[in-house]
């Protein structure tokens, strides 16, 4: 028997789709609210011959290829199967998709939600559910937070959950203790941005357990009912451009089409790419470059605060790992490729970087980080600062030659 669902953006009903177990069997898009389609699904509108079966004045009916696009969007919204402690979230005889749909697929980072045809819930009630967030004490002492619907749309491999502290919403990312260095990178990145005088970043702090060992990191939420997160992946996927060699250059252009300041986007991308290079963050993929969109006008207002600078578990310490040939899970395959796209190395003030002692003091809080690995990371930091200085000199000489 098929289940019937409606996809909404706030109060706008966008489409109706049917689900047979985990398979989407049909979808009808409401043309009256077509502007509210999730950005990746707007690819349908640019390629109707490929994704549309029938179109009339009021609706668009998707063909099998169109249903695959919708399925991909839903899959990206649910928690991934490689999530740490996945089985704590997903009960027996259930799966991530059904758990998400049971909880209306709402998220704290955007205004989309999904309702079963048999439910009578409205958007005001969804907002109440969004606000039903545990405070930190109850979260860490009660495993039931794993099952709260507010966490059913949190992506990424690391275990994470929303909570409230002094009335403000925060995100906690947890990691096994042997990978505490991932949290250290978030804290180091925060220190670098602070010293640069750059404000548009998530200020991460360590989360420690009762024996004072690092088990995660936390930061304030930066989205709300009026400001939602869209990613570089969303912008690229709309035009099927995620695999292009010039994605670094395409992202600011596509963001500008929706209202972003192209120059500011370019500057922030250059800065975060350089900082990632300094701290060996190997995970700045398309989903980790974000923008804040006005949820009413659907226009980009600004770049999102820089988030997720900690790298990823499966690449921690993996070779090749050196000055330029380090493999990354990013816009390109290696750091060397990524650095070749940076427009302006002078966006970083090297004189304001944290000292090696300041970086070491952060690493020292990670007791599972071996002394050998710590010294290697500190060596990389110093070596990479020298590299950036040289790139800045090369660029300044090049600019001087152009003026002559």
Predicted regions and their residues:
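Phosphate/dinucleotide-binding and metal-coordinating scaffold of catalytic cores
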Residues: 1-274, 278, 292-404
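Glycine-rich phosphate-binding P-loop
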Residues: 281-282
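Conserved protein-kinase catalytic-loop segment immediately C-terminal to the catalytic Asp
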Residues: 285, 290-293
């Amino acid at each position: 028997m098929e289940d019937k669902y409606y996809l909404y953006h706030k109060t706008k009903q966008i489409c109706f789709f049917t689900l047979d177990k985990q398979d989407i069997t049909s979808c009808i898009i409401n043309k009256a609210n077509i502007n509210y389609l999730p950005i990746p699904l707007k690819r349908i509108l640019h390629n109707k011959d490929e994704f549309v079966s029938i179109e009339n004045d009021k609706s668009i009916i998707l063909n099998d290829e169109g249903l695959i696009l919708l399925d991909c969007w839903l899959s990206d919204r649910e928690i991934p199967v490689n999530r740490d402690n996945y089985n704590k979230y997903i009960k027996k005889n259930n799966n991530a998709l059904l758990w998400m749909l049971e909880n209306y697929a709402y998220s704290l980072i955007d205004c989309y939600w999904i309702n079963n045809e048999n439910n009578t819930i409205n958007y005001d009630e969804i907002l109440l559910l969004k606000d039903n967030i545990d405070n930190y004490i109850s979260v860490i002492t009660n495993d039931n937070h794993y099952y709260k619907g507010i966490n059913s749309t949190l992506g990424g491999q690391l275990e994470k959950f929303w909570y409230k502290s002094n009335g403000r919403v925060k995100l906690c990312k947890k990691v096994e203790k042997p990978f505490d260095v991932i949290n250290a990178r978030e804290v180091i990145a925060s220190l670098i941005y602070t010293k640069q005088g750059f404000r548009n970043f998530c200020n991460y702090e360590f989360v420690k357990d009762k024996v004072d060992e690092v088990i995660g990191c936390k930061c304030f939420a930066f989205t709300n009912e009026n400001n939602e997160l869209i990613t570089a992946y969303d912008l690229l996927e709309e035009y099927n451009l995620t695999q292009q060699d010039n994605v670094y250059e395409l992202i600011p252009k596509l963001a500008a089409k929706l209202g972003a300041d192209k120059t500011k986007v370019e500057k922030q991308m250059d800065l975060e790419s350089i900082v990632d290079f300094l701290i060996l963050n190997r995970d700045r993929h398309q989903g980790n470059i974000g923008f804040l969109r006005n949820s009413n006008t659907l226009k980009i207002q600004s770049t999102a605060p820089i988030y997720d600078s900690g790298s990823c578990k499966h690449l921690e310490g993996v070779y090749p790992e050196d000055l330029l040939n380090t493999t990354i899970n990013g816009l390109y395959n290696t750091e060397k490729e990524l650095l070749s796209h940076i427009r302006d190395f002078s966006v970083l003030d090297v004189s304001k970087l944290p000292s090696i002692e300041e970086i070491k003091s952060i690493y020292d809080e990670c007791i599972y980080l071996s002394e050998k690995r710590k010294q290697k990371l500190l060596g990389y930091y110093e070596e990479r600062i020298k590299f950036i200085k040289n790139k800045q000199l090369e660029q300044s000489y090049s600019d001087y030659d152009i003026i002559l």
